[in-house]
Regions:
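Extended low-complexity, serine/threonine- and proline-enriched intrinsically disordered segments
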Residues: 76-91, 162
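N-terminal leader/pro-regions and domain N-caps
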Residues: 1-41
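A short beta-strand element within beta-rich, extracytoplasmic domains
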Residues: 58-68, 76
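Proprotein-processing/basic-patch segments
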Residues: 141-169
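Short beta-strands within extracellular/lumenal beta-sheet-rich domains
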Residues: 39-57
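Cysteine-clustered segments with highest specificity for TGF-beta superfamily mature ligands
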Residues: 116-148
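Extracellular carbohydrate recognition and processing domains
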Residues: 90-128
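Short coil-to-beta strand junction motifs in C2/discoidin
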Residues: 72-80, 154-159
Length: 169
């Protein structure tokens, strides 16, 4: 039993025409930090697509690597949804495919440093009948209006990497 890993970069994200995180490149002291800037007051979402290479069974884990722009306290809520299509089998229109019900995690800022890197794991159990070889679209959103849980961290939350993992058996 092995774990399959899909790494998703901020620059590869796709967005709709509204309610999306801005792509930013923060110029650090020693290297640039590309990120998606999720707003604190408006729900925003970004999308990535990948092939479910060697998917076996079980839940999918979405690990969000993020940091706060300025805040040193508070909670941020991340939501993940999947939409899976089996090529040459499903008759679903790829442009109108619906997402499975979302899963979420509430992560607490660990304090003291505004731009401290955090990671939060979302266990995705609503899998949209994912199978090996499926074309999968991931929706990652910040729940700024606290529909799923309380998101009270002030300012932007910057996503620097998303890692999707699942079992091959």
């Amino acid at each position: 039993m092995a774990t399959v890993t899909q790494e998703l970069d901020p620059a590869a994200a796709h967005v709709l025409t509204s309610a999306f995180p801005a792509f930013v490149k923060n110029v650090g002291t020693n290297f640039p930090v590309p990120a998606l800037a999720y707003d604190a007051t408006t729900d925003e979402a970004a999308f990535w697509s990948f092939i479910a290479t060697s998917y076996g069974a079980g839940n999918v884990t979405v690990r969000v690597y993020w940091y706060a722009d300025t805040a040193t306290t508070g909670n941020v809520v991340w939501e993940a949804q999947l939409a899976a299509i089996t090529p040459n089998s499903d008759s679903q229109d790829i442009e109108t495919k619906a997402f499975a019900t979302l899963n979420f995690v509430q992560d607490t800022h660990l304090g003291t440093t505004g731009q401290r890197l955090h990671s939060a794991d979302i266990t995705v159990s609503n899998l949209d009948s994912i199978a090996a070889g499926d074309h999968v679209t991931l929706r990652l959103a910040r729940d700024a209006n606290s529909t799923s849980a309380t998101d009270d961290m002030a300012g932007d939350a910057y996503v620097v990497k998303v890692v999707v993992t699942y079992s091959d058996s």
